[in-house]
Regions:
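Conserved, carboxylate-rich catalytic/transport cores that coordinate ions
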Residues: 1-299
Length: 299
């Protein structure tokens, strides 16, 4: 729906992303697309680009296929209701969605396996509390409440991460021009300063050859979890790291301890995802010739 060089394409490129304000959303794409024909609305057939994966009990992707598909959403679910099913064991909600409960339970089982595998390799999870602002009828802020990051939101995060990793690795080995989401190793000087600071609280970092493994930072965050100094040390750890970037070279993602990573899952609200979808579709349709490769390399 967003053709290259069209007016919608040009405007999406200018915006780059959707903006989520306190009381409204300014979408990257026109609302007719973002809330309509591109949105997985209940009971509607929608064109999609899917990463279909076979994952074993160890959390390893043993087979996958990236394909143009048609998705029809049978039921519209909310994070709240999925949480009530999986965590709260709410009898009324379980009864309402009883035909879907076994699938949610399998999804939760798989998400836990994927999360455990990421943590084992050293992926860092900054679980900062998010907030939402409550407004009165006149649009004035009257309260700030914590945003609940629960089993349902984490489940979706786990699935998005594995899809992004799988797509990035696939296109890296195909040697097709691509946009990766990369996160470089932190500067040794900043890590040294962090190490010196946390020593005051009795914590240490093992730094080898002037660099630190993400697993060391993960261990630190686990040690400070629930302590009085957790907020301070967690934020200083985050500031010690570099910002993630979009690059055409696949140099890995330090924070996720991943060799391959991209942003594939949100083409409605992020321009890099939209560009990736365009590249993938051209490749699937057999149109990725030398001219198109040169075109993508040039931009």
């Amino acid at each position: 729906y967003v053709q290259e060089r069209s007016a919608v394409y040009v405007e999406a490129l200018k915006r780059g992303t959707s903006f989520y304000l306190v009381d409204r959303v300014i979408p990257m794409l026109p609302r007719e697309l973002s809330n309509g024909i591109c949105s997985l609305n209940e009971g509607c057939d929608r064109l999609a680009l899917s990463c279909i994966m076979t994952i074993n009990k160890k959390g390893e992707v043993i087979d996958h296929k990236i394909a143009e598909t048609v998705i029809k959403t049978n039921r519209r679910m909310t994070y709240t209701n999925v949480k009530k099913i999986l965590a709260d064991k709410d009898a009324a909600v379980i009864e309402e969605y009883k035909e879907l409960v076994p699938m949610f339970e399998k999804m939760a089982e798989l998400a836990a396996i994927l999360r455990k595998k990421r943590m084992k390799r050293g992926s860092i999870d900054f679980d900062f509390p998010e907030t939402k602002v409550v407004l009165d009828e006149d649009g004035h802020p009257i309260d700030i409440k914590p945003y609940d990051r629960n089993v349902a939101t984490k489940l979706i995060e786990d699935f998005m991460l594995i899809a992004n990793e799988t797509v990035a690795e696939d296109y890296f080995w195909q040697e097709i021009p691509f946009v990766y989401r990369t996160h470089d190793k932190p500067d040794s000087e900043k890590i040294a300063k962090l190490s010196t600071f946390i020593n005051n609280f009795g914590y240490t970092l093992h730094i080898g050859a002037d660099e630190v493994h993400p697993k060391e930072l993960q261990k630190l965050l686990m040690k400070v979890d629930g302590t009085d100094e957790e907020s301070l040390i967690s934020r200083l750890t985050l500031r010690s790291m570099k910002q993630a970037r979009y690059t055409t070279a696949c140099t890995g993602h330090f924070g996720l301890a991943a060799n391959y990573y991209c942003h594939f899952t949100s083409p409605i609200r992020r321009y890099p995802d939209l560009q990736i979808h365009r590249i993938i579709k051209e490749n699937i349709r057999g149109r990725m010739n030398d001219n198109r490769r040169e075109h993508y390399e040039s931009i």
